[in-house]
Curated annotation (Swiss-Prot):
One of the primary rRNA binding proteins, it binds specifically to the 5'-end of 16S ribosomal RNA. This is Small ribosomal subunit protein uS17. It comes from Polynucleobacter asymbioticus (strain DSM 18221 / CIP 109841 / QLW-P1DMWA-1) (Polynucleobacter necessarius subsp. asymbioticus). One of its GO terms (cellular component) is cytosolic small ribosomal subunit. Pfam families: Ribosomal_S17. HAMAP family: Ribosomal_uS17_B (MF_01345_B). GO terms for biological process: translation. InterPro entries: NA-bd_OB-fold, Ribosomal_uS17, Ribosomal_uS17_bact/chlr, Ribosomal_uS17_CS. PANTHER family: 40S RIBOSOMAL PROTEIN S11 FAMILY MEMBER, SMALL RIBOSOMAL SUBUNIT PROTEIN US17M. PROSITE patterns: RIBOSOMAL_S17. Keywords: Ribonucleoprotein, Ribosomal protein, RNA-binding, rRNA-binding.
Amino acid sequence: MTELSKPLRRTLVGRVVSDKMQKTVTVLVERQVKHPVIGKYVGQSKKYHAHDEAGTYKMGDTVEIAESKPISRTKSWVVTRLVEASKGI
C-alpha cells in the first residue's frame, strides 16, 4: 500500500506592513517577473493576511508565511518563522 503524504504547503517571504489587527498581520510579498513580450523584469507585489496567534511579529519584520486551510474570509496563511527582525530607530 502507498503511504499518504501531507501535501507540500506553499511558502512565501515578505515584510510585515501592518500589525493593527488582533492575531493577524499583513505581509507584503514582492516578486520580480519577466515581461512576456518586452523581456524586461517588472516588480509585482501582493498583500496577504497571515495568522499570528501570539501577536509577536511587528511592523518591518521580514517573515515567512505558509499556506493553510482558511482561517477566516481573508486569512488562509500562517506566519511560520521570523527571517529578520526590523531595524528599530
